Amino acid sequence: MGLVLKEFNNKIRTALILAPFFTFAQIVIDLIIPSFLASAISVVFSIDKLKQDESGGKTISVDFIGGANINFANVREAQIVLATTVILLALCGLFFGLISIYCASYVSANTSFLLRKKIFAKLMRITTPSHDHYGSSTLLVRLTNDVYLMEVIAFDFLRLIIRAPLLFIGGLVFAVTTNQDMSISLLITFPLILLVIGILNRKSIPLFKENQKSVDKINERVEEDVSGYKVIQSFNLHSFTNNKFKIANEGWKKNSTSSLFINSLNIPFTFFLSSLTIIIALLLVFQLDSSVSVDPLPQDAAIRPNIFAFFQYNFYIVLGFILTSLTMVNFNRSRVALGRIKDILSQPEIKTITNKDQKELLPTLEFRNISFGLGNKNNNNFLQNLSFKFEAYKTYGIVGPTGSGKSLIANIIGGLYEPNEGEILIGGEKIQSIDSLYLSEMIGIVFQQNILFKGTISSNIKIGIETRSDWKNQSDLQKNEAMKNAAKIACADTFIEKFSDSYDHNVEQLGKNLSGGQKQRVAIARTLITKPRILVFDDSMSALDALTEKKVRENIENDLKLTTKIIISQNINSIKHADKILVIDNGRIVGFDSDQKLMKNCSLYQKMKESQKDLGGDFDAVN
């Protein structure tokens, strides 16, 4: 709750105060009621004597626990007053309890709402290495299950954490006041209850940690298998994947069984010790209280109500222990969850730079001695001492074998990774001094993995301009025209207009109802609509046929003459038209020149081009 306390509005703060207040009021009433019930029982057991007193003209005196007594004119008045008082107290307790529950529910629900909002906003801002470290399955668990546990403990804090000690302390005080002889039994069983709860609580914490790890593994397993179901189907890997899931599921079952068993022992042990308390109390009262006889004689009337009240307060003491143990279970689970949430919230964020005096920059890109490794260790850099410069308005290619580091360069250009060494310059300015918003609007990247969002084709293409400052005052008509123009450049209009609902065609989650080529063209249009001044294609035309790819390249060259274009690909045919081509091998630059010159002075480029010719990779004759 403390993580979002500052974000509480006045309504939530009011509920935060009222919840414990009405909980306290409810407990006070609950503790008073047994005293009135005991007095009512004393009236019932002494009814004959009271009638005799009444006939003799005497007032009726009813004793209450704690030594207080009230005089009544007759038996009927005593019955009516006591019955009415108990009913009114019960109704007040119910009313206060309902208000307390509502306020606690309101606060806990808003706590989870604000916490989930805060975590989600953080996930959208954490650095790519942090995201890669945790993985989407673990992040999903922390956003859902862990936040739910925090909601539970917030409710417990406002209700049970206050209710449990009040029931215990209040029950203990009233029990001692009711009958000191019977209260001796509490000295015997009370330490045993504390010992049991302490031992079980200590054993449960590591089990909950292991249980949360098991949940992460199951989510990771499910996410991987569901995402790769086509591979599983094609290779008939059902038994293999079922076995892997079974292992993860059995690990969770084992940890869950142990944690549930340990924490469930609280209740039976507590009830056992409660019954033991009652037995010891009865033995003590018959041994120590000489007013109690074997036969139900009138002199026993005073002790019988006290025995009833003592049992009631003993129940409150036991209930306080049970609520404490249940709260401790949730507390231990939430403490593990809180640590995991704090771990996420403490992760470094993408740096935001504000420069109100930001000037227009030429779309040039320069790497100066850039080194980078996913391990973030300078002595383990994969990209080694990269230095090159892309001039404005020209087209550049980046090519290299699989795993050579091409996509790493794209991610560094897009600001997803920060280099361990070296400098990046845009328009001759160090990237650290450029306004972040200006930079994001200046650079556009079409990533290797084309992620589309659930919605429509229109919403997916226009999502790129929804938050841009230069589009805020544009009309829907202007946005639609820009969308159609971007789709035309990306050759996406040819299939979009075949749909009956055209640009309003439904797109399922991750674009599952579109083909690979269709998704790539929508993704290209989504970036083109932003009119970036530096445009990066990270192997983002791989699903297009040769004719369509050539047409898209030609459209981009003709329509984006004032844009610096960077095309990353393994296919020589996709980049050989570029003004210059950067050849990467194992994280190092092995060539940077035009296609013709690289064919003379770069052996790797020569080998790649020859191998792709042999495989039918040169499509010039076809095109």
From Swiss-Prot:
PROSITE patterns: ABC_TM1F, ABC_TRANSPORTER_1, ABC_TRANSPORTER_2
InterPro entries with a match to the protein in the record: AAA+_ATPase (IPR003593), ABC1_TM_dom (IPR011527), ABC1_TM_sf (IPR036640), ABC_transporter-like_ATP-bd (IPR003439), ABC_transporter-like_CS (IPR017871), P-loop_NTPase (IPR027417), Type_1_exporter (IPR039421)
Membrane topology qualifier: Multi-pass membrane protein
Domain ABC transmembrane type-1: 16-325
Pfam family for this entry, one: ABC_tran
Residues annotated as domain ABC transporter: 365-611
KW ATP-binding (keyword) present: yes
Listed SUPFAM superfamilies: ABC transporter transmembrane region, P-loop containing nucleoside triphosphate hydrolases
GO terms of molecular function: ABC-type transporter activity; ATP binding; ATP hydrolysis activity
GO CC terms of this entry: plasma membrane
Protein residues bound to ATP: G400, P401, T402, G403, S404, G405, K406, S407
PANTHER family per UniProt: ATP-BINDING CASSETTE SUB-FAMILY B MEMBER 10, MITOCHONDRIAL, ATP-DEPENDENT PERMEASE MDL1, MITOCHONDRIAL
The organism's taxonomic lineage, starting at the top: Bacteria, Bacillati, Mycoplasmatota, Mycoplasmoidales, Mycoplasmoidaceae
Annotated compartments: Cell membrane
Alphabetic keyword roster: ATP-binding, Cell membrane, Membrane, Nucleotide-binding, Transmembrane, Transmembrane helix, Transport
Similarity comment text for this entry: Belongs to the ABC transporter superfamily.
Originating organism: Mycoplasma genitalium (strain ATCC 33530 / DSM 19775 / NCTC 10195 / G37)
Segments traversing the membrane: 27-47, 81-101, 157-177, 181-201, 266-286, 307-327
Protein name (database record): Putative ABC transporter ATP-binding protein MG014
Chief place where the protein resides: membrane
